[in-house]
UniProtKB/Swiss-Prot annotation:
UniProt protein name: Glycerol-3-phosphate acyltransferase
GO molecular function: acyl-phosphate glycerol-3-phosphate acyltransferase activity
A Pfam family it matches: G3P_acyltransf
Pathway(s) per entry: Lipid metabolism; phospholipid metabolism
Domain of life: Bacteria
Keyword terms: Cell inner membrane, Cell membrane, Lipid biosynthesis, Lipid metabolism, Membrane, Phospholipid biosynthesis, Phospholipid metabolism, Transferase, Transmembrane, Transmembrane helix
Residues annotated as transmembrane: 3-23, 75-95, 113-133, 156-176
BP-aspect Gene Ontology terms: phospholipid biosynthetic process
Species the sequence originates in: Thioalkalivibrio sulfidiphilus (strain HL-EbGR7)
GO cellular component, one term: plasma membrane
Amino acid sequence: MLLASALVLGAYLLGSVSTAILVCRLAGLPDPRSQGSGNPGATNVLRTGRKGAAIITLLGDLLKGLVPVLVAHALGLEPVWIAAVALAAFLGHLFPVYHGFRGGKGVATALGVILGIQAWVGLAALATWLIVAAISRISSLSALTAATLTPVYMYLLTGERWYVAAGVLLAALIYWRHRANIRRLLRGEEPKIGNKTKNKSEV
């Protein structure tokens, strides 16, 4: 119990590390919170025109979700604790203690924790994102579609209630963090992937 609780706390603290802010500082780029959508995420870093920085941000956000969950599996924790570790890492990204509890929208970190919980579920969610992105070129729509289907994939591929519950909570939080994007989608005003914009629209 103590070890599991410590891992949950560690997952939150790791999730709170903002890869986007770190990468932009090291690369001499503007703070992602002060440009584009204002969101510290890979899509907003991409809007600076630095694809390499965006890729590093994406990988960093994914890994900080993936690693704690893999550690939880390696330690033989029960599904309820693995789900708790996954949610803690995700919540750290959304509400980082190091940045005034104002974080990103969590799509890459969510993918990381899902891959950690069950690799096939993560790959199914990633495939969903890629297919929708290829058709629409809208990052938020791709993320929302993948989030919607993740609990379904989790149920079909694991049958574990705690993992399904984690998938539902992840999806709900992603929807909540994308509420402005949803309004723009309904108005047909959401920008496409790769567009440089000053609008507050980021995944």
